[in-house]
From Swiss-Prot:
The active site is at 185, 395, 447. Belongs to the peptidase S10 family. SUPFAM superfamilies: alpha/beta-Hydrolases. One of its GO terms (molecular function) is serine-type carboxypeptidase activity. Its EC number is 3.4.16.-. Probable carboxypeptidase. GO terms for cellular component: extracellular region. It is an enzyme of class 3 (hydrolase). It comes from Arabidopsis thaliana (Mouse-ear cress). This is Serine carboxypeptidase-like 25. Disulfide bonds join 92-358, 252-263, 288-326.
Length: 473
């Protein structure tokens, strides 16, 4: 009898300890989640938080399955919101960029030999869910090859919603948690489009998703104003000549998906003859000509890719870059390791191609892209969804001028006029708060803001979750 009481007492104490740490025993509906638990990744330092990764099927008929990686909060995860991070491209991996270069808990060592801690990881104050979408990106796959040549915004949004619904069945402890959707670049489409799918779902569901807000950075927003703002940025930052600038302005119809041959030629001339060998994602950072791990030239198929952003003319090729600036290579080495894939429960179907940071097949066959997402912004603002938009001010791909031109079309009333915000007594950037939307610049940051300015990005994220204006001192 005494032994039985002791066993009961021990069990209750164990549950109490787990609850005090913000964790709950896994049982019932979460048995499936337990199979996704990551015990440890190769070369990983010791951590106190829990990790899960695996696949969620979003379309059984075609066999479309999306890969995710959840890194729970390092302290009291049950009290923290769920933050979904999406990378753009389209066709680029949130595991390669968001998780491994920007906001995740780990960075990849040179040569892909192991991992080290990111001291500005966003999972210190949230539960981070990285999603590789659509199928064909990273470890996500489809059994119907035609999906890779026939995808776009609408299917991506619908599959992402289906993923989230199914994922919450697997992780019921997140069912009523506050949800925030974040991302950058072409995720300027993914994020608001997923938010709209959630809002529509909530109207017809008995179990609505607790979407609280979105935040996007250097985000593709509106074709016309993004393109106009991009060309203006090139000229104002002395990247192109007066002559080329005026020719682009007078020749190109920035609203069109497919530009005239004359306009395409002007874009190509500007980038090939006038830009020079720069990193377009951070015009003041060194380009990745040689990998710093001694791998020699790094312009091949497994290195930086020339990718097209759909808001730009079809012939315009953009480099997807990182900053060391060759970190993309480390990710491709690390995530192609069989021991890493096993630890992540990834590539379980033995996909017949290597894991890559970006899919050129998807990027070049993207056939459905909205010309603007500004109407969705209006819907979110009207629906009380928190909306923050930030911009690294040395990115020339989706530059700050593009974002400002696009947001100006919303004609929002100003609540707090333009002012500098501070990080460690230094100007972190500038911000303006509108009715329903906060706009923030990050000084000296490139396209991947958390990569170039991790401390400032973390402060930005912290205030976003609080729903408070950034500090004036």
């Amino acid at each position: 009898m005494a032994m039985a009481k002791l066993a009961i007492f021990t069990t209750l104490m164990a549950i109490l300890v787990m609850t005090s740490q913000g964790r709950i025993p896994t049982e019932g509906g979460e048995k499936e989640a337990e199979a996704d638990r990551i015990t440890s990744l190769p070369g990983q330092p010791n951590v106190t938080f829990e990790q899960f990764s695996g696949y969620v099927t979003v379309d059984k008929l075609s066999g479309r399955s999306l890969f995710y990686w959840l890194t729970e909060a390092s302290d009291l995860p049950l009290s923290k919101p769920l933050v979904i991070w999406l990378n753009g491209g389209p066709g680029c991996s949130s595991v390669a960029y968001g998780a491994s270069e920007e906001i995740g808990p780990f960075r990849i060592s040179k040569g892909g030999s192991g991992l080290y801690l990111n001291k500005f990881a966003w999972n210190s104050i949230s539960n981070l869910l990285f999603l590789e979408a659509p199928a064909g990106v990273g470890f996500s796959y489809t059994n119907r090859s035609s999906d890779l040549f026939n995808t776009g915004d609408r299917r991506t949004a619908k599959d992402s919603l289906q993923f989230l619904i199914q994922w919450l069945h697997r992780f019921p402890r997140y069912n009523h948690r506050e949800i925030y959707i974040t991302g950058e670049s072409y995720a300027g489409h993914y994020v608001p489009q997923l938010a709209k799918e959630i809002m529509n779902y909530n109207k017809r569901s008995k179990n609505p998703l607790n979407l609280k807000g979105i935040m996007v950075g250097n985000a593709v927003t509106d074709n016309h104003y993004d393109n106009l703002g991009t060309v203006s940025y090139w000229w104002s930052h002395a990247m192109i000549s007066d002559r080329t600038y005026h020719q682009l302005i007078s020749t190109c119809d920035f609203s069109r998906q497919k530009e005239s041959d004359e306009c395409e030629t002007l874009y190509s001339y500007a980038m090939e003859q006038e830009f020079g060998n720069i990193d377009q994602y951070n015009i003041y950072a060194p380009p990745c000509n040689k990998s710093s791990d001694g791998g020699g030239s790094y312009n091949g198929s497994s290195g930086r890719r020339s990718m097209r952003l759909p808001h730009l003319p079809h012939s315009v090729l953009r480099k997807i870059s990182g900053y060391d600036p060759c970190t993309e290579r480390y990710a491709e080495i690390y995530y192609n390791r069989p021991d890493v894939q096993k630890a992540l429960h990834a590539n379980t179907t033995k996909i017949p191609y290597k894991w890559t940071a970006c899919s050129e097949v998807l990027n070049r066959n993207w056939n459905d892209t909205d010309s603007t997402v500004l109407p969705i912004y209006r819907e979110m603002i009207a629906g009380g969804i928190r909306v923050w938009v930030f911009s690294g001010d040395v990115d020339s791909v989706v530059p700050v001028t593009a974002t400002r031109y696009s947001l100006a079309r919303l004609s929002l009333s100003t609540k707090l006029p333009w002012y500098p915000w501070y990080v460690k007594k230094q100007v972190g950037g500038w911000t303006e708060v509108y009715e329903g939307l906060t706009f923030v610049t990050v000084r000296g940051a490139g396209h991947e803001v958390p990569l170039f300015k991790p401390r400032a990005a973390f402060e930005l994220f912290k205030y976003f979750l609080r729903g408070k204006p950034l500090p004036k001192a």
